[in-house]
Design a protein with these regions (language model features):
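Membrane-proximal helix-turn-helix segments that form the acceptor-binding/catalytic region
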Residues: 167, 180, 197-226
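Conserved small/polar residues in nucleotide/adenosyl-binding loops
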Residues: 248-251
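A short, glycine/small-residue-rich beta-strand->loop->alpha-helix junction that serves as a flexible
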Residues: 13-26, 52-54
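Active-site donor-binding segments of glycosyltransferases and PAPS-dependent sulfotransferases
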Residues: 43-82, 203-208
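Nucleotide-activated donor-dependent transferases that construct or modify glycoconjugates
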Residues: 3-20, 46-47
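Conserved nucleotide-sugar donor-interacting segment of glycosyltransferase catalytic cores
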Residues: 118-195
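Conserved nucleotide-sugar donor-binding subdomain of glycosyltransferases
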Residues: 87-142, 197-213
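A short, Lys/Arg-enriched amphipathic alpha-helix followed by its capping loop at the start of a domain
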Residues: 29-39
């Protein structure tokens, strides 16, 4: 592989838009470090409902918004917003939708109750990022996915979007964290994630109902590298990545 000059970051959390955490700090600092090495970056995260748009100066990018993504036979408008972290000279794109992200937290609500449609939210987020990158006509060399909400991106990149100029030559890296959800995903999850170019065979041993470990293993199947970013990660995921000779443990 030639030198990675363009890096796409797809993550769940970035400070200062959400509270500091292991993932949010990496989501903030790693893209800046890569950019300071002279690389070109694009960074995406969901527009969670607890992000203050006025304080963080988010604004909609009209030319990128307006597409409808069909999930479970329902149209869901894709809204793209953008903001800048001035101290890092870094721009962040936000994937937004009234049904999935407005007035809603991350995995669970303020009472700790996990959202029943987390599977659909993950499908929308992954597809929303990839469709936006296509519109930008930008071709990353490396795509670095952080956290379970991004776990479908490797499958989509390597199957549904494999012939797209923006993605056909990209290498995919998946970072796992201690960010597991407790409930299983909906019983029709496999049907929801299907797109042209993806067959049931491509889902391997994915059996419903799908839990956190199974979702992350699906990401491992279609990644070129896996990074363990938290000390405490489901051991079955780590062993699965190790058997695939893909695992790198972050120092």
């Amino acid at each position: 592989m030639t030198k990675a000059n363009k890096v796409l970051f797809i993550t769940q959390e970035i400070t200062p838009y959400v509270s500091e955490s292991e993932m949010a700090n990496i989501g903030r600092n790693l893209p800046q470090a890569i950019q300071e090495k002279g690389r070109e970056i694009r960074t995406f995260m969901p527009k969670w409902g607890n992000i203050n748009e006025r304080r963080n100066q988010l604004h909609e990018v009209i030319r990128l918004s307006g597409m409808n993504l069909i999930i479970d036979d329902t149209d869901h408008p894709l809204i793209i917003k953008v903001a800048s972290i001035q101290s890092a000279r870094m721009q962040v794109y936000f994937i937004d939708n009234d049904d999935y992200f407005q007035n809603r937290m991350q995995t669970a609500d303020e009472n700790g109750v996990e959202y029943e449609d987390n599977d659909s939210r993950a499908v929308f987020y992954a597809r929303g990022v990839l469709e936006t990158v296509k519109k930008l006509r930008w071709c990353p060399d490396v795509i670095h996915c952080h956290g379970w909400m991004t776990a479908l991106a490797p499958l989509y990149i390597k199957k549904a979007y494999k012939d797209e100029p923006s993605f056909r030559d990209a290498k995919v890296v998946f970072s796992v964290y201690e960010d597991d959800f407790k409930n299983t995903l909906s019983d029709d999850f496999a049907a929801k994630l299907m797109l042209k170019g993806i067959s049931k065979k491509d889902l391997g041993d994915l059996k419903e109902p799908v839990d956190y470990a199974a979702l992350c293993k699906l990401a491992v199947d279609y990644s070129d590298g896996v990074i363990q970013n938290s000390e405490k990660v489901d051991e079955s995921i780590i062993e699965y990545a190790r058997q695939s000779c893909l695992l790198y443990t972050s120092p």
